[in-house]
Curated annotation (Swiss-Prot):
InterPro entries: Ribosomal_uL18_bac-type (IPR004389), Ribosomal_uL18_bac/euk (IPR005484). GO terms for cellular component: cytosolic large ribosomal subunit. The keyword Ribonucleoprotein applies. The gene is rplR. This is one of the proteins that bind and probably mediate the attachment of the 5S RNA into the large ribosomal subunit, where it forms part of the central protuberance. Coiled coil: none annotated. Keywords: Ribonucleoprotein, Ribosomal protein, RNA-binding, rRNA-binding. Transmembrane segments: none annotated. This is Large ribosomal subunit protein uL18. It comes from the Bacteria. Gene3D superfamilies: 3.30.420.100. Belongs to the universal ribosomal protein uL18 family. The lineage of its organism: Bacteria, Pseudomonadati, Pseudomonadota, Gammaproteobacteria, Oceanospirillales. Part of the 50S ribosomal subunit; part of the 5S rRNA/L5/L18/L25 subcomplex. Contacts the 5S and 23S rRNAs. GO terms for molecular function: 5S rRNA binding; structural constituent of ribosome.
Amino acid sequence: MNTKKQSRIRRARRARLHIRDLGANRLTVHRTPRHMYAQVISPCGSKVLASASTLEEALRGSATGNKVAAKEVGTLIATRAKAAGVTSVAFDRSGFKYHGRVQVLADAAREAGLEF
């Protein structure tokens, strides 16, 4: 019997295979009930080019598990990725539905200039 987490991990693994075939940098997102995390990872998968999360001092003071926090993380990851020389990425939702906080983070990253 599959648990909810095992099903999500299986979906994520399947999507990552397609992203790896593209050979693009990937913007990966992880969410927990309390926090949001985002990383831009190199095509080979061995190097993190930029990262942002609600655990950082700048974002920790406000609410960390809602859409407002997700929007701030999306904006921050886009500015850090552009500073690292990354302009386009493949969006890796890590098996989460493209809805709610994941969607808000992606939209904020697009508005801040990241292409995907």
